Amino acid sequence: MEDTGSIKQEAQSHPPGIFEIPGEPAVVINGVPDEPQTDCMIAKDEPISSGTVGSGEWLEGREVRKFFLGRYYSGTVTKFDKQSGWYRVEYEDGDSEDLDWSELEEVLLPLDTKNSNTNAQSEYGEAGQRVNVKAPYPGHKPEKLVTTTVKAPYPGHKPEKLIPLVDDILTVGPEITSEEVGRAQGIFASADQNNFGLLMAFNFVFTKGEFSGSTVSMYGRNPIFSKVREMPIIGGTGAFRFGRGYAQAKTFTFNTTSGNAVVKYNVYIWH
């Protein structure tokens, strides 16, 4: 957590062990401000490789879309400067600007992977560490569906609902060849009559590595066309017993032909 100001103890306004952080509510457990535990398989000081998200030249050619003064402008990432870490973006109207990664991430469009071998990836995430969820593979049957029938509540409503059953691969990195560390198992279903929102019920099941035998359970609403979607972590087993927290999902790539997507999950768990 970045420092937002000096931490001071107010003996008069707060009991001993209660600390006030300017601009934030005091949250204390045994006299220590509570912070989420976010163990990560990839060390924070590990050098960033050229294949890491937001790391450089491989983003050249990616498309962007920016909202400015009441309209959207489409553009392309044309150059990455290694020394400054800035990305040059040229827009359809002839204008251009230099953006850092945090700014570029805000306008970067999902990558269409329909002509790429990365089709085999469906989800990318971090559940206490960096993991991948991959869907289609040889022998995989994507048409695993539960069909239910409900009474149509309004004209034009489609009574048949399809609920995909998910049993996908968890890997250390986004590459197809990355080491498998577990499975992502669960269901999702359309659960919004007005917008495209899903009900997600997922278990991240770790079968290898430090968290082998442990699971993390995620359950909540996923408005998949929103830029960032937040869902609750409602529990866990093994290393994540009594776990609680939240997950933030962000679409990284989407295949318009197969429907497969790569989604980055940042998961924060108190346990």
Swiss-Prot record:
Residues 1-12 have a biased composition (Polar residues). One of its GO terms (cellular component) is apoplast. Keywords: Apoplast, Glycoprotein, Secreted. Glycans are attached at N255. Residues 1-22 are annotated as: Disordered. The keyword Glycoprotein applies. Gene3D superfamilies: 2.30.30.140, Allene oxide cyclase-like (2.40.480.10). GO terms for biological process: phenylpropanoid biosynthetic process. It is found in: Secreted, Extracellular space, Apoplast. Belongs to the plant dirigent protein family. Homodimer. Dirigent proteins impart stereoselectivity on the phenoxy radical-coupling reaction, yielding optically active lignans from two molecules of coniferyl alcohol in the biosynthesis of lignans, flavonolignans, and alkaloids and thus plays a central role in plant secondary metabolism. PANTHER family: NUCLEOPORIN-RELATED. This is Dirigent protein 17. The lineage of its organism: Eukaryota, Viridiplantae, Streptophyta, Embryophyta, Tracheophyta.
